[in-house]
Amino acid sequence: LTLDTLEYARMSGRVGALSAALASALNVKPIAVLKDGIIEMVGKVRTRKAALKRVIEMGQEAYSDQPVFLSVVHAHDLESGKKLLAEAESLFNVKDTIITDLSVSLATNFGPGTVGLVLYPAE
């Protein structure tokens, strides 16, 4: 997942006010992984484009040429979701895809503009 802003994470208490302000001023986009119900911040990049690229790279590192089912999730940002889906479809060995809204519990904490990939093996 990549967050468009840390403002909602700040309001939910997951990120401090100073961190959110600095991220906003520097146009930093955090990268988070949700695995087994645990959210972990795993990186930060300077632009939205770089963040989406890094999300795809992480998927490639995990699945390389392995056949996968691919889902793109988004929080009120269908356009970014569609772009991410098109890019990912061209790079992965995809068996099936879906694009859907991010769950309400995550969208509330991460805010609008959050976009991510969900990959799992097709075999």
Ranges and model annotations:
Residues 1-123:
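Mixed-charge interfacial surface used for oligomerization/domain docking
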